[in-house]
Amino acid sequence: MSLCSSFNVFASYSPKPKTIFKDSKFISQFQVKSSPLASTFHTNESSTSLKYKRARLKPISSLDSGISEIATSPSFRNKSPKDINVLVVGSTGYIGRFVVKEMIKRGFNVIAVAREKSGIRGKNDKEETLKQLQGANVCFSDVTELDVLEKSIENLGFGVDVVVSCLASRNGGIKDSWKIDYEATKNSLVAGKKFGAKHFVLLSAICVQKPLLEFQRAKLKFEAELMDLAEQQDSSFTYSIVRPTAFFKSLGGQVEIVKDGKPYVMFGDGKLCACKPISEQDLAAFIADCVLEENKINQVLPIGGPGKALTPLEQGEILFKILGREPKFLKVPIEIMDFVIGVLDSIAKIFPSVGEAAEFGKIGRYYAAESMLILDPETGEYSEEKTPSYGKDTLEDFFAKVIREGMAGQELGEQFF
């Protein structure tokens, strides 16, 4: 699930800005289908970055113990991409698949960690997974079990230079968020560092700036521990935290129904929130940039797609324009969601199992009202101008493609698998 999408809430540790807006059991089978390119792809595009200062945090456990003799050079950035081992977790998720492809395109030696049954509801078997990740070394393992993951990496017989985490909880539920967005992601850090990794690229989300949801708390906790590791404990270790805005596919859910003549649904006047949506290809390219570009070392990197920020109203207008029809909107009062959430919260006090349903309601409410843009700490407002742009793919082109071809292959959810 892409949790920082625009659907168009718990106290949390939130790092205080310092300088803002600078220029299974072990599955022993290991299958290899690798054909990395020899060429280097390296860009020097600048982007807005954030750095934080924090109180000293409790160190991540196990990072300093049991360092393997299988180690890589700390100067991996001086190597040719074909000699750099990049471990990608969450490799079969929506963004993870594109990250693997982009890394292979740039010539890195990619190790893609996947489960034997991957995809939404585990619909993909090993053969399909190998096909999807062609060109990568596919390692079948389980990121939710640290000992299993470590054994898997040990069996590779070589070290790791960089870990790229594209893990995300399936649906943003309370238990799932802490299991995946925090624990499994931490496992990938611990295991990667044990086998020599010197850099960690984390796919996070721009919405963690205003943490009202459980998955945001889980992501922020890991972010803080990752930063503390690099900045306070181990100066030879670095990170890049990527916080994207909305993904194209998260905004495409209404294309088919509008195409069939139904109205475009939005909350309020359609101007409650805005985003600078980014395509999966462009985001994957930005994540790949973070492996070697030194201006992205130890940075929190919010990133959006090209062009202006778009409200739900404007997104709907673009869709009707492509279809050549007069806009037809259904405006839903956001107070309806507040009422439903209030009822679910009250029931959850008596029946805790309802808490998950209440959380899902809060997620929908959040995306209906909060912009996926940089939150300016000085004004307390979301800023289109301060949200950096990257890439070339536009939402209009995406909508046109979906109208022609449908949303096949664009299923959201279960980024973990």
Curated annotation (Swiss-Prot):
Reactions catalysed: protochlorophyllide a + NADP(+) = 3,8-divinyl protochlorophyllide a + NADPH + H(+)
Pfam families attached to this UniProt entry: NAD_binding_10
Highest taxon of source: Eukaryota
Primary location group: plastid
Tissue: Highly expressed in leaves, stems and flower buds. Detected in roots.
Keywords noted in UniProt: Chlorophyll biosynthesis, Chloroplast, NADP, Oxidoreductase, Plastid, Transit peptide
Transmembrane intervals: none
Gene Ontology terms for molecular function: 3,8-divinyl protochlorophyllide a 8-vinyl-reductase (NADPH) activity
Entry's pH dependence statement: Optimum pH is 7.0.
Pathway, per record: Porphyrin-containing compound metabolism; chlorophyll biosynthesis
PANTHER family: DIVINYL CHLOROPHYLLIDE A 8-VINYL-REDUCTASE, CHLOROPLASTIC
Role according to the record: Catalyzes the conversion of divinyl chlorophyllide to monovinyl chlorophyllide. Reduces the 8-vinyl group of the tetrapyrrole to an ethyl group using NADPH as the reductant. The best substrate is (3,8-divinyl)-chlorophyllide a (DV-Chlidea). Very low activity with (3,8-divinyl)-protochlorophyllide a (DV-Pchlidea) and (3,8-divinyl)-magnesium-protoporphyrin IX monomethyl ester (DV-MPE). No activity with (3,8-divinyl)-chlorophyllide b (DV-Chlideb), (3,8-divinyl)-magnesium-protoporphyrin IX (DV-Mg-Proto) and either (3,8-divinyl)-chlorophyll a (DV-Chla) or b (DV-Chlb).
Protein name, as recorded: Divinyl chlorophyllide a 8-vinyl-reductase, chloroplastic
